From Swiss-Prot:
Disulfide bonds: none annotated. This is S-protein homolog 17. It is found in: Secreted. Transmembrane segments: none annotated. The keyword Secreted applies. Belongs to the plant self-incompatibility (S1) protein family. InterPro entries: Self-incomp_S1. One of its GO terms (biological process) is regulation of translation.
């Protein structure tokens, strides 16, 4: 019984050590005073919908799961009529060793850009680059 208690204690420390704080940031860098509509969801959570004013941003901190399968999908729409839109995977882990980091999305007139920041535990960090075009 004592060995089981020690095992459970060590196992729980490992589990708590792995659960990390990941972040999604969505910034409105559109021109012509356009607002940005956003809504994101995962298996367990729904973020939004929110209207992000020009120059503003939305930031959410969340824990990743132990199995390394945390995903967030987002839909962005350009104001004022919200005709131009894009739906995409805004966050995903690449393995159980990946801790997520900051996925920094920027909505611009010509598309949606991503910069992924992190430390040595972040898989595949990337500099700011265009990932998606707007759909009409």
């Amino acid at each position: 019984m004592k060995n089981l208690s020690i095992f459970m204690f060590v196992f729980s420390l490992c589990m708590f050590g792995h659960v990390s704080r990941a972040r999604i940031r969505i910034a409105n860098e559109l021109k012509f005073k356009k607002n940005l509509w956003m809504r994101c969801y995962s298996k367990d959570d729904v973020l939004g919908p929110h209207i992000i004013p020009i120059g503003g941003h939305f930031l959410d901190y969340f824990g990743t799961n132990f199995w390394g399968t945390t995903r967030f999908m987002c839909t962005l729409r350009q104001g004022p009529n919200y005709i131009h839109y894009q739906s995409f995977t805004a966050f995903k882990l690449f393995s159980m060793e990946d801790h997520g980091g900051l996925w920094d999305w920027r909505a611009r007139e010509d598309g949606i850009y991503l910069k992924k920041e992190g430390n040595k535990f972040i898989k595949n960090p990337v500099n700011m680059h265009k990932v998606y075009d707007w759909i009409n």
